[in-house]
From Swiss-Prot:
GO terms for cellular component: ubiquitin ligase complex. This is Protein yippee-like B0546.4. Residues 117-161 are annotated as: Disordered. Keywords: Metal-binding, Zinc. It comes from Caenorhabditis elegans. GO terms for molecular function: metal ion binding. Zn(2+) binds at residues 18, 21, 74, 77.
Amino acid sequence: MGRQFAGICGARGSLYGCVVCNTYLTCSKELTSKAFTGSTGPATLFKRAWNVVYGRCEHRKMTTGWHTVRDVFCVTCNQKLGWMYEMAVSESQTYKETQVIIENANFEKIAGAIKDPLGEDRQEAPPAPNLEMSRYPLEAEKKSRPQYRTVSVSSSSSAEC
């Protein structure tokens, strides 16, 4: 059986997956910071993650203050990966809200850089349209138009509709 994933959802750059089952979790474009510490050691803050399930909301005292968090688990193997910040009490910590901490021991790089299938990373400008050429020549366009005749209708008081 191959890797399970619900979707890559516009993932670009390096892909990261669960260390146990290699299920796709997130990508390097979603990375916010590597300067975090989890319960098992270093951790990484990502804007979002896919193929995860969330536990119940809990209030936890962390090194930066009180936070409302949910544990995050791999959808395939149920490995605990880290947590998601639901709410921060301190105003200076609100940037973490809705972001996901994944402990470095629980994920690994699963692929090199991938090519953007939609071409959204393209830096060059799109080609300018050629306005001199048209789909139909002007004369052919005139000939293909339906010709309508105008008919005048006089109304009389004795005419019935």
